């Protein structure tokens, strides 16, 4: 019986840890903290297109 209780507690702790890590990853993505590589890809796809460049001037600032 003790072994079963130990397994249940271990499983609950593992599940709580796994779901917390997954939700933290989703929160980072939802809050707009995109990696630089994604930002560069969006900019590189948008800036050559005149319509996209006009609608999103913040992405294609002239330097």
From Swiss-Prot:
Ranges for the region named Lacks the Ser-Xaa-Pro motif that is crucial for potent interaction with nAChR are 48-50
Could you give a GO molecular-function term held by this entry? ion channel regulator activity
Keywords from the UniProt entry: Acetylcholine receptor inhibiting toxin, Disulfide bond, Ion channel impairing toxin, Neurotoxin, Postsynaptic neurotoxin, Secreted, Signal, Toxin
The record's listing under InterPro entries reads:
Conotoxin_a-typ (IPR009958)
Subcellular location as annotated: Secreted
Indicate yes or no for the key word Cell cycle. Answer: no
Which segments are removed on maturation as propeptide?
A: 22-43
Q: Which cysteines are joined by disulfide bonds?
A: 46-52, 47-60
Q: Which Pfam families match?
A: Toxin_8
Gene Ontology CC terms, in alphabetical order:
extracellular region; host cell postsynaptic membrane
The Swiss-Prot or TrEMBL record describes its family as follows: Belongs to the conotoxin A superfamily.
UniProt protein name: Alpha-conotoxin-like PuSG1.1
Q: Which organism is it from?
A: Conus pulicarius (Flea-bitten cone)
